[in-house]
A protein has these predicted regions:
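Residues that define the transmembrane beta-barrel architecture of outer-membrane proteins
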Residues: 118, 140-148, 201-207, 261-267, ...
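Outer-membrane beta-barrel "beta-signal"
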Residues: 427, 461-487
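Detector for outer-membrane/organellar transmembrane beta-barrel domains
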Residues: 273-281, 298, 308-414, 425
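Repeated loop/turn-to-beta-strand initiation elements of outer-membrane beta-barrel proteins
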Residues: 120, 157-162, 217-221, 275-279, ...
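Transmembrane beta-barrel strands of outer-membrane/channel proteins
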Residues: 122, 126-130, 163-169, 223-227, ...
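Residues on the lipid-exposed face of transmembrane beta-strands in outer-membrane beta-barrel proteins
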Residues: 110-111, 124-126, 148-154, 207-213, ...
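N-terminal periplasmic/intermembrane-space "pro-region" immediately following the signal or transit peptide
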Residues: 23-123, 138-139, 151-157, 164, ...
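Surface-exposed coil loops of outer-membrane beta-barrel proteins
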Residues: 174-308
Length: 487
């Protein structure tokens, strides 16, 4: 594999985010636990009234307990109370995208504030930099991947209501046609299929409501509605996974695993008992159109079911299956998608380690042809010494939409949808260079190598190599002492 030289661009960036309101933290869905010791998930103390803090006795190892009504904290763990139950608590770290679970110990950068009966949370991630994709089909672009997600939680009647929104400026900050990403496929631009590009996310990524009611001391029943929203299909969406927290690129397996995370019309209901969650969705399975600023109206004729399992604070697993009716505008035909994933998170002294293994399979039928496409992802991010990150993503994926008509002519291929097994291997690092009580600024870079059938060499080159250099802004990590001072 040829060696690559590139000039590292230096950017001066000044970001001031001072807030006179005390906030705490929680990322797109995660909250870091500074100590590795996992405390049992206790019930809120019946004697603790909302807004109280119970100090442990002098010299005691017992963790501090705080109770602010809807929001309960015990030691290093944060919980959301369901209704008025003293025992039915949801770990905040477990709350993933849509109705997904992730390990409860997952780090979660966020800003939060208690406002009357409401618990308000603000999550965002802003990444900008240079994206260089290698080989004859690669280009170099300056771009920004970003999202902002406010949410609000309060008691309503016998249960707890969560309102969530999510927005992205990518329709304005991605290059025309999408972010360059070698071997990526899915969706369209100007009526043509996107190839070697990742489409921008919609301006409106999620507008949802989730209402959960306790059933006894250990269970709850919930209903989730989103327009747009995320059905019960696939793992935690890639931009919310702690294992991919520093990786700015979508997986090449995105459209075999978690591409339904923006669906214009979703209703999900399910039942959660202790470590298990069983849920089903009725939703619109059509991928968002090229107009990234509107609300789309398509039939809610797709369905899915998912079983999730979280045996302790450091593990979460899911298996799901769904029928998507005509998801692609240019390829009429249904897709039956099956996914399975395992996520692990381990906090340790001055750091955290998050990893995921994900498999997705599309059984597709187009114009009388049947395709079985598989995607495998292994990704991991380790944070160490407070501000340093190393990360990787290794994936193998089947692609059958890589070739245009002129490409097939060049390669002498007559098959309309030839399938190729593609490998992508990303290695990168980042470092926080400036932290305040509210904001964290980091710089980072990664490099990606590929494997592919040699028949693709005339159009992709023998050994293409891609790289990125970026600046990342998000809420800063917080300490427990700072959180105690918040209230």
């Amino acid at each position: 594999m040829s060696r690559m030289k590139y000039a590292l661009m230096c950017a001066a960036f000044w970001f001031a985010a001072q807030s006179h309101v005390a906030f705490a933290q929680h990322e797109g869905h995660t909250m870091p636990q500074p100590k590795p010791a996992a405390t049992p998930k206790p019930a809120a103390s019946p004697s603790a009234s909302p807004g109280t803090m119970e100090e442990p006795a002098a010299g005691s190892d017992e963790p501090m307990h705080m109770d602010h009504g809807i929001f309960v904290m015990h030691g290093d763990e944060m919980f959301v109370r369901l209704g008025e139950s003293e025992t039915n608590l949801i770990p905040m770290g477990r709350m993933g995208s849509g109705t997904t679970w992730q390990p409860a110990s997952t780090p979660m950068p966020m800003l939060h504030k208690q406002s009357g009966e409401w618990l308000l949370m603000f999550h965002y991630n802003f990444v900008m930099g240079v994206n260089r994709q290698g080989g004859p089909r690669g280009v170099t672009k300056f771009e920004s991947a970003n999202w902002f997600m406010p949410s609000a939680i309060r008691r309503v009647g016998p249960g707890t209501l969560e309102l969530r929104a999510m927005f992205s400026a990518e329709p304005f900050t991605f290059p025309p046609g999408g972010s360059p990403l070698l071997f990526q496929t899915g969706e369209t631009y100007k009526g043509e299929p996107l190839i070697d590009r990742q489409h921008p996310h919609d301006l409106f990524m999620e507008l949802s409501a989730n209402y959960a009611v306790p059933v006894g001391e250990r269970a709850n029943w919930f209903v989730y509605f989103g327009y747009p929203g995320e059905p019960a299909l696939g793992p935690n969406a890639f931009m919310h996974r702690a294992s991919a927290s520093e990786n700015t690129s979508a997986p090449l397996s995105h459209h075999l695993q978690d591409s339904s995370h923006i669906s214009f019309g979703v209703v999900t209901t399910g039942f959660n008992y202790r470590w298990f969650k069983l849920e089903g969705s009725l939703f619109n399975g059509r991928e968002p159109g090229e107009n990234r600023y509107n609300f789309e109206a398509n039939p809610w004729n797709s369905r899915s079911v998912r079983l999730q399992f979280a045996p302790n604070t450091n593990w979460s697993m899911q298996v799901s299956h769904g029928l998507l009716k005509n998801p692609e505008a240019l390829e009429p035909g249904d897709v039956r998608r099956t996914t399975a994933s395992i996520s692990y998170n381990k906090p340790f002294e001055r750091g955290n380690w998050a990893s995921s293994l994900i498999w997705g399979r599309n059984h597709e039928s187009h114009d009388g042809e049947i395709f079985n496409l598989n995607g495998y992802v292994a990704e991991s991010t380790v944070k160490f010494l407070d501000r340093n990150y190393l990360y990787t993503r290794l994936e193998l994926v089947d692609k059958n939409q890589l070739l245009r008509d002129d490409d097939r002519l060049t390669l002498g291929i007559t098959e309309h949808h030839p399938s190729f097994r593609i490998g992508a291997y990303t290695f990168g690092g980042a470092r926080d260079i400036w932290n305040t009580t509210a904001t964290s600024l980091a710089i980072g870079s990664d490099v990606t190598f590929y494997s592919k059938p040699s028949i693709l060499n005339p159009i992709y080159g023998t050994n293409p190599v891609s790289w990125k250099v970026f600046v990342r802004i998000r809420p800063s990590q917080m300490t427990m002492s700072r959180m105690h001072g918040t209230h």
